[in-house]
């Protein structure tokens, strides 16, 4: 008589009946044992080959060092390393989609395009891995990035910037692929003139 075995992979057991749970086998693999690299590898397999090779070099160069530094700092909230790298991947997906036209204009073998992709990676790294840091720790994270990379904007030399600015004061322009100060994008707020009471 033939036997049938069903194997189902579910995210959780919220909607499972007691009969299902009693027959379920649960395998737990700690993220500490697994690490972030398999998740990054899965992400890179979905990218264009040339782009994946360039991004792989950035993952190798920055991520382990950034996570090691984060252990010495005091983030505002505790997020697992897998969660931080997941945020990094999500930001990279969004940023490369926004910059797709600019990135596709030239081959990734060109230094200008590799530098553009590295700027996007550093921006995503700062706002994912270093995104929950306070001002003092952000300055340390910025110092680490500047010691590891030579393509960060020089504070005080970009339009709208001051010498105390960090990477958090800049964004990568979708048109030029260069660093742009947030102050250039966001106009200074001025209170409306006239009687504010009339608005109510």
Predicted regions and their residues:
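Conserved phosphate-handling catalytic cores of large alpha/beta enzymes
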Residues: 48, 53, 63
């Amino acid at each position: 008589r033939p036997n049938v075995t069903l194997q189902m992979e579910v995210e959780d057991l919220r909607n499972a009946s007691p009969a299902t749970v009693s027959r379920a086998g649960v395998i737990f693999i700690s993220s500490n044992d697994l690490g972030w690299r398999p998740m990054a590898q899965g992400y890179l397999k979905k990218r264009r080959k040339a782009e994946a090779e360039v991004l792989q070099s950035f993952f190798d160069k920055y991520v382990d060092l950034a996570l090691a530094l984060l252990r010495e700092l005091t983030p505002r909230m505790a997020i697992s390393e897998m969660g931080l790298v997941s945020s990094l991947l999500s930001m990279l997906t969004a940023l490369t989609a926004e910059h797709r036209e600019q990135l596709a204009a030239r081959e990734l073998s060109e230094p200008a395009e590799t530098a553009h992709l590295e700027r996007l990676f550093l921006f995503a790294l700062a706002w994912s891995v270093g995104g929950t840091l306070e001002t003092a720790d952000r300055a340390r994270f910025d110092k680490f990035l500047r010691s590891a990379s030579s393509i960060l904007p020089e504070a005080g030399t970009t339009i709208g910037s001051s010498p105390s600015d960090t990477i958090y004061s800049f964004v990568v322009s979708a048109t030029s692929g260069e660093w742009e100060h947030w102050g250039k994008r966001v106009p200074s707020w001025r209170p409306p003139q006239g009687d504010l009471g009339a608005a109510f």
